[in-house]
Amino acid sequence: MSEDRAVRLSSQQILYTKAAILSAALTGSILTSYALFNRYLKQYTRVTQIPLSAFRKNWLYGKVTSVGDGDNFHLFHTPGGILGGWGWARSAPKLDKVNNKRSDSLKRLFFPRFLRRQKEQEKFQSLNVPFKGRRNLPTLSIRLCGVDAPERAHFGNAAQPFSEEALIWLRHTLIGKFVWIKPLSLDQYGRCVAKVKFWSWTGWKNVSLEMVKNGIAVVYEGKTGAEFDDERDIYIFHEQVARKERRGLWSLKKFETPGNYKKRVG
């Protein structure tokens, strides 16, 4: 009898041990899955949700849903992309298409800019904006790093030259597209200052740098809050090239930088 009892106790101990091991493994698996989800698949719907550990280190992926000014836009965060379920398990917002005039498209197709001798402003005014922006979505407010676009009309103050062209270019380039952003800091308005990149048929493009190259933004002049992700010299170089070749706003005889404009109008 004592031997049978010992066998039963031993069997029970083995079962308890197996149950404990299985429970620990299951708990560990759940905790690991939760940690991985938070790190790679958790959607951020507000800038304040971005963890401090992500700044200057991680890249976030998402869809541009609206462009409100020449140097900022709204991003719908889609972590993980297709692998994260977007497009089949989770849905990103759809944007309505803009009906562009056929004549404009044909004009650009058969009469290249260098033959039409367009003025600098007309180059940007002729760009098509493919989609209408959508507001009131759970998006991240993004401010482009390293640049200042010409100021649009605000509070009764006149718009700067090329402010509308900068807005058109940014909408043409970004709206409706999926981009990568690298958070760098938060500005005084609660926006995420970030480096923004997208893929084109010629390779990766830095949005801020492309604006400087096209002469529709200047290198950020502020003494505080300037973010270049250690690439300020590259921005300065391309601004000098754009100035020398009189691209965009540098084609003007007189130009007041956005920084000086904001100081003047207060």
UniProtKB/Swiss-Prot annotation:
Keyword Membrane assigned: yes
Pfam families xref list: SNase
Keywords on record: Calcium, Endonuclease, Hydrolase, Membrane, Metal-binding, Mitochondrion, Nuclease, Transmembrane, Transmembrane helix
SMART domains assigned to the protein according to its UniProt record, in alphabetical order: SNc
TM stretches of this protein: 15-37
One GO cellular component, as annotated: membrane
Membrane topology classification: Single-pass membrane protein
Compartments, as annotated in UniProt: Mitochondrion; Membrane
Protein EC: 3.1.-.-
Annotated coiled-coil segments of the chain: none
Gene Ontology MF terms: endonuclease activity; metal ion binding
Residues binding Ca(2+), per UniProt: D148
Similarity comment: family membership: Belongs to the LCL3 family.
Protein's name in the database: Probable endonuclease LCL3
Taxonomic lineage: Eukaryota, Fungi, Dikarya, Ascomycota, Saccharomycotina
